[in-house]
């Protein structure tokens, strides 16, 4: 088992990089990959950059160049569940695009043509994440739908539409569904684990800048605890 771990931004991967034993650095297409081990597991950690295209490139390289057999996406997200606070965690029960619309051809809202409507995470990784929750102290974690789009969501009008389209959505972010789609194409197991940095509202730009470090630390703690369960 070799586990590829992807975060979009430096605060989302810095704690994981610091935890790597015997790190080896490789740069491809301007993306740095750090190989080594965490909790005795072979890992490759990368900061992909923000958005679906960047995440897709990094995921493909992890699988093709570094032979990742499993992929974990970690980082921050905007929350859509009132019971969760900033810093709490959502473990993907499924992952969908929220900004895709080819319904004119009979697809569901959010479903890319010739792709499943939802990408389902690997049960072993999800169960390991659920078992790891006990290691997080007072940080709350739930399973839920995570939706992805190439926009930072802070507009109440957009938020309202997203809630109508995806009433069970727990969190939104900008990479997870792209990573999940690449993993689906390559038949590689994945899970998305996100810590809330904001609540997808008018305050989100300020909240994100204030809490991205906290969210990154919590999601990294979750990933390390997950690796210890495997």
Curated annotation (Swiss-Prot):
A GO term from the CC aspect: cytosol
For biological process, the GO terms are: L-methionine salvage from methylthioadenosine; L-methionine salvage from S-adenosylmethionine; nucleoside catabolic process
UniProt-annotated binding residues for substrate: 78, 153, 174-175
The record's active-site residues are 12, 198
Alphabetically, the GO molecular function entries are:
adenosylhomocysteine nucleosidase activity; methylthioadenosine nucleosidase activity
EC number in record: 3.2.2.9
Q: In which pathway does it act?
A: Amino-acid biosynthesis; L-methionine biosynthesis via salvage pathway; S-methyl-5-thio-alpha-D-ribose 1-phosphate from S-methyl-5'-thioadenosine (hydrolase route): step 1/2
Enzymatic reactions: S-adenosyl-L-homocysteine + H2O = S-(5-deoxy-D-ribos-5-yl)-L-homocysteine + adenine; S-methyl-5'-thioadenosine + H2O = 5-(methylsulfanyl)-D-ribose + adenine; 5'-deoxyadenosine + H2O = 5-deoxy-D-ribose + adenine
Q: What class of enzyme is it?
A: hydrolase
Q: Which UniProt keywords are present, listed alphabetically? A: Amino-acid biosynthesis, Hydrolase, Methionine biosynthesis
User: Domain of life here?
Assistant: Bacteria
Q: Which family does it belong to?
A: Belongs to the PNP/UDP phosphorylase family. MtnN subfamily.
* Job description of the protein: Catalyzes the irreversible cleavage of the glycosidic bond in both 5'-methylthioadenosine (MTA) and S-adenosylhomocysteine (SAH/AdoHcy) to adenine and the corresponding thioribose, 5'-methylthioribose and S-ribosylhomocysteine, respectively. Also cleaves 5'-deoxyadenosine, a toxic by-product of radical S-adenosylmethionine (SAM) enzymes, into 5-deoxyribose and adenine.
Descriptive protein name: 5'-methylthioadenosine/S-adenosylhomocysteine nucleosidase
Question: Which species does the entry assign this protein to?
Answer: Shewanella frigidimarina (strain NCIMB 400)
């Amino acid at each position: 088992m070799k586990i590829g771990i992807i975060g979009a931004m430096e605060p989302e991967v810095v704690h994981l990089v610091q935890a790597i034993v015997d790190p080896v650095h490789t740069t491809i297409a301007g993306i740095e990959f750090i190989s080594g081990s965490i909790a005795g597991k072979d890992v490759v950690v990368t900061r992909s950059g923000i958005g679906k295209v960047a995440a897709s490139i990094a995921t493909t390289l992890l699988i093709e160049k570094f032979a990742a057999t499993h992929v974990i996406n970690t980082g921050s997200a905007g929350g859509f569940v009132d019971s969760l606070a900033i810093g709490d965690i959502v473990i993907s029960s499924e992952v969908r695009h929220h900004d895709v619309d080819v319904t004119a051809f009979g697809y569901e809202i959010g479903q890319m043509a010739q792709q499943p409507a939802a990408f389902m995470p690997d049960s072993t990784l999800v169960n390991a994440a659920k078992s790891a929750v006990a290691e997080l102290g007072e940080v709350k974690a739930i399973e839920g739908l995570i939706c992805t789009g190439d926009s930072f969501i802070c507009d109440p009008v957009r938020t309202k539409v997203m809630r109508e389209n995806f009433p069970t959505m727990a969190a939104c972010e900008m990479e997870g569904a792209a990573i999940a789609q690449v993993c689906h194409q390559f038949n590689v197991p994945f899970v998305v684990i996100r810590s809330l940095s904001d609540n997808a509202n008018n305050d989100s730009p300020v909240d994100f800048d204030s809490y991205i470090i906290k969210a990154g630390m919590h999601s990294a703690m979750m990933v390390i605890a997950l690796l210890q369960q495997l």
